[in-house]
Amino acid sequence: MSNVKLISTSSPDLIADIAYMARVSNPANQSNELTSRKLVEYLIKHKHWSPFEMCGITMEINTTRDIAHQIVRHRSFAFQEFSQRYADPAALEGWPYELRETRLQDTKNRQNSIETDDALLQQHWIAQQKRVIDTASNVYKWAIEHGIAKEQARTVLPEGLTKTRLYMHGTV
């Protein structure tokens, strides 16, 4: 399961900073923090986003490599990802793999999947994933033990099951 943790913000009081930026054309009232929250709510309601772009956040995202690839396509952010070229995925705490839930293809929306309550299918899906992980893990370990470079050995690891960590920085 993916999880996200806030690492840092560009300021200890983002609300006050966003309001300050929004009041650029009203210098006499620019430092008024009493109405900052109300102003930020107004900006959101009326979709005035430019003041939010003045403040930044950095988040830590723990997910699988296939989801990470989808995230990094958003080019308005800067990314730093755990490198399997230099480190073994086992360096991330816990088991370096994540078993995926059993979901069926939605027949009406190809970009959607739906839950299933088929217990037998779920058992088989978990067993198949474990077989892939066992095989890939053994091949990866064999490659490392035989001097194969990590950057080459990592190619056998399953993208959708192998965990990764990335840091994402962008504007609020």
What is each stretch, according to the model?
Residues M1-V172:
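Family-specific signature for flavin-dependent thymidylate synthase
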